């Protein structure tokens, strides 16, 4: 199945959330898991998406049906296929994130002294 942009976004959000949430537990034999409802709640509260909770739930169901995520014992997680797709998405967007960070951190005008300016009307 080809992933739609919405499915890619949800898969990336879930994968990145797990990656960041579990960083604090690297030295311990523990792992954080969340339910579908909690994931939807986190995504909505953080303002990551504008979709209705029902639409997010349906997208998670589609990802589960196509074996990108699994839901066992109220724990939502990426499958091997989902992990592989997440890593590919991350690899594809990393250059854009790096450029955005570089431009945001340092004044873009400081990279060159030969810039041109024109009056805009």
Q: What do these predicted ranges mean?
A:
Residues 1-34:
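Short alpha-helical segments that sit at the start of domains
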Residues 2-6, 31-32, 55, 109-115:
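Clustered cysteine/histidine zinc-coordinating segments, centered on FYVE zinc fingers that bind PI3P
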Residues 29-53:
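Short helix-coil junctions and helix-kink-helix linkers
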Residues 48-65:
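Short amphipathic alpha-helical interaction segments
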Residues 64-74:
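A short, conserved structural fragment
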Residues 75-80:
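Minor-groove-contacting beta-hairpin "wing" of winged helix-turn-helix DNA-binding domains
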Residues 83-113:
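Short, amphipathic alpha-helical interaction segments positioned at domain boundaries
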Residues 115-121:
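Domain-edge interaction signal
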């Amino acid at each position: 199945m080809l992933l739609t942009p919405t499915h890619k976004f949800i898969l990336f959000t879930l994968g990145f959330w797990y990656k960041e949430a579990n960083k604090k537990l690297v030295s311990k034999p523990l792992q954080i898991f969340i339910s579908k409802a909690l994931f939807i709640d986190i995504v909505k509260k953080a303002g990551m998406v504008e979709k209705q909770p029902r639409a997010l739930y349906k997208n998670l169901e589609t990802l589960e049906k196509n074996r990108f995520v699994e839901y066992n014992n109220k724990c939502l997680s990426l499958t091997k296929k989902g992990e592989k797709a997440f890593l590919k998405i991350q690899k594809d967007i990393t250059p854009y994130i790096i450029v955005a960070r570089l431009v945001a951190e340092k004044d873009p005008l400081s990279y060159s002294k030969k810039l041109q300016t024109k009056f805009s009307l």
